[in-house]
Design a protein with these regions (language model features):
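Stable alpha-helical structural segments in soluble proteins, enriched in small hydrophobic residues
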Residues: 33, 79-90, 352-362, 366
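Non-catalytic, well-ordered alpha-helical scaffold segments
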Residues: 17-20, 24-27, 74-81, 252, ...
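Gly/serine-rich nucleotide phosphate-binding loop at the start of the catalytic core
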Residues: 1-76
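Well-ordered beta-strand positions in beta-sheet-rich domains
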Residues: 4-8, 150, 180
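Acidic carboxylate diad motif detector
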Residues: 52-156
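Generic detection of short hydrophobic beta-strand segments and adjacent strand-loop junctions
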Residues: 7-9, 135-138, 199-201
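Long, hydrophobic, amphipathic alpha-helical segments used as structural scaffolds
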Residues: 34, 38-41, 87, 91-98, ...
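Positively charged, helix-rich recognition surfaces that bind polyanionic ligands
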Residues: 142-147, 157-367
Length: 367
């Protein structure tokens, strides 16, 4: 199994210069090979493979631009492979057509491959050995065992540097459990389960969102490209990063608990891209991070021998009585939070009842 371990690194001035060079050269090669691919297709209507692009880089670009030879060759090759992956996504998944990369992008990264011990993590000295950088000081808060496959060096908008070490390792599955659960994703709360547990949205994020609004207001009054403008911009980036990290950490804790305690997990397959088109709900939907939660549940279920099922978006989970199956049209009104079934008299909390119906439908599909 492949697992990634992310660590913050603290490069010295020379290493920062080399990292910046690598970012720039990878961006340059990405853009040049993308332009080459477009040109060949425009002239000859001929598809160009990633191998052709790599050969073009080695034979033409490195000959014309000598400074490319100062950069780790695997980083340049992976930049070409990333460009090819964007092309494949465009054709297979109907994603947007690949765009040229800008030096003003907030997130910069490059990936290098392991070969002949060129990447190594020393937990005793707290340093990571990387190609062209030698030993870089790092905060190694988690140990791992296994074979290193690659390393991705990145710099986020706040200016911090990170390295993600991809490792081939063994994963011990969680013990089997007989408990199953349905999950109703919400806006007021993150999610509600079929056994009545409510996972609330984090209130502390509101505190940082208020700080963010204040900083953005301050930024609007700063002179563009002034020192204070860039200082405030960095504070905004740090605030965004804080919110993102708090939210992701919470989602990991929630998903770990759900996966640990249940064998079958069922949720709705919500079309989030379509839902955020509703401008009244877009921010609320983005804030609760449904996509990230379901993504974590999906891969953690695979790791641990669990079954994660997504039922149809249009399944009437909120309208059905989970006891007798009666469909109550009155519950189409979202303001109806509790109701009594006219057929069997069962009392329902809207969200818990929906979660029970989601579980029933999921179990029916795998029966």
């Amino acid at each position: 199994m492949l697992k990634a371990y992310k660590y913050r690194i603290y490069p010295n001035s020379g290493q920062r210069i080399q990292i910046a060079k690598t970012f720039g050269c990878c961006r340059f090669v990405y853009n040049q090979t993308l332009a080459y691919r477009r040109e060949i297709y425009g002239k000859e209507k001929k598809s160009v493979s990633k191998t052709d692009c790599n050969n073009y880089c080695n034979r033409e670009l490195k000959k014309d631009y000598e400074w490319l030879k100062e950069i780790d060759k695997f980083a340049l090759t992976n930049a070409i492979y990333n460009m090819d992956a964007a092309y494949q996504k465009f054709f297979k998944e109907h994603a947007g057509y690949p765009k040229f990369k800008s030096k003003h992008d907030n997130h910069k990264s490059y990936t290098t491959n392991f070969t002949n011990g060129n990447i190594a993590v020393d937990f005793e000295t707290g340093k990571i050995k990387l190609p062209k950088l030698k030993a870089v000081k790092a905060r190694l808060h988690r140990e791992y065992s296994g074979q290193i496959k690659s390393a991705t060096v990145s710099q986020v908008s706040s200016g911090k540097y990170y390295v993600s070490i991809l490792v081939e390792t063994e994963h011990k599955e969680l013990a089997h459990t007989n408990h199953n659960i349905g999950i109703d994703l919400g806006i007021k709360d993150l999610c509600i389960t079929s056994d009545g547990k409510v996972y609330e949205n984090l209130k502390i994020i509101k505190k940082y969102e208020k700080q963010l609004v204040k900083l953005q207001r301050q930024l609007s009054h700063k002179g563009k490209r002034s020192k204070n403008y860039y200082k405030t911009k960095k504070k905004i980036a740090l605030c965004h990063e804080k919110i993102r990290n708090i939210r992701k950490d919470y989602l990991h804790k929630v998903s770990h608990e759900i996966i640990s305690e249940n064998q079958v997990i069922v949720s709705e397959n919500l079309q989030i891209k379509n839902m955020v088109k509703n401008h009244h709900l877009a921010k609320a939907i983005s804030d609760v991070s449904w996509y990230e939660l379901t993504r974590q549940l999906e891969y953690k279920a695979k790791w641990n021998g669990r079954k994660y099922i997504k039922i149809d978006t249009f399944y009437a989970s909120s309208q059905l009585c989970s006891v007798c199956g009666y469909q109550n049209p009155d519950t189409k009104d979202l303001s109806v939070r509790t109701w009594i079934c006219p057929k069997c008299g069962a009392e329902h909390d809207r969200d818990i009842n929906a979660a029970k119906n989601i579980l029933t439908e999921g179990l029916r599909q795998i029966a």
